[in-house]
């Protein structure tokens, strides 16, 4: 960033109240409110998830940074996160509902690059509950997410199963 010293004050003011945890550094594309190709409001989902994390008062490191794309175009790079969501829709009881496909165990770390594994579809309304359950599971383990996931590589998927449609 090319920021002069005299511009620092306004920049700090504009970013006040920004990300306070690793989870709040999560990535979301611009989403369907702006993007003509977007299917889901990825920014709106991320905002709901950050509100949930703050309400639950999870310690920093309990939830990982996640990646959210509002459609298959992957502008939110959902495939590279340990948890990623790709926007879509799912018919449930003959009603088309907002949904996201869940991807897990992706990585953009140099030397460990891999695409995440798609494990299923989750209704948008269920995603905060899924991540809340994950957060409590990690918190109750007495470790942070990285340590918990290293010891429980199937942990995310086993929690997610009950939220998939």
Predicted regions and their residues:
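Flexible, active-site-adjacent loop/turn segments at secondary-structure boundaries
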Residues: 73, 81-83, 113, 143, ...
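Generic recognition of long tandem-repeat/solenoid scaffolds
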Residues: 1-7, 100-103, 156
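Small-residue-enriched alpha-helical segments and adjacent helix-cap loops
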Residues: 1-95
């Amino acid at each position: 960033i090319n920021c002069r010293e005299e511009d620092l004050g306004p920049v700090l003011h504009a970013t006040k109240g920004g990300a306070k945890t690793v989870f709040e550094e999560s990535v979301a594309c611009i989403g369907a409110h702006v993007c003509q190709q977007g299917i889901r409001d990825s920014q709106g989902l991320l905002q709901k998830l950050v509100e949930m994390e703050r309400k639950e008062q999870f310690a920093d490191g309990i939830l990982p940074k996640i990646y959210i794309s509002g459609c298959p175009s992957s502008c939110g790079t959902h495939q590279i996160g340990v948890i990623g969501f790709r926007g879509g829709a799912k018919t449930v009881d003959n009603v088309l509902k907002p949904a996201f496909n869940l991807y897990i165990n992706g990585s953009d770390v140099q030397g460990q690059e891999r695409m995440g594994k798609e494990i299923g579809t989750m209704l948008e309304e269920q995603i905060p509950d899924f991540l809340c359950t994950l957060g409590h599971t990690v918190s109750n383990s007495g470790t942070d997410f990285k340590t918990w996931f290293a010891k429980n590589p199937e942990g995310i998927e086993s929690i997610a199963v009950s939220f998939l449609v």
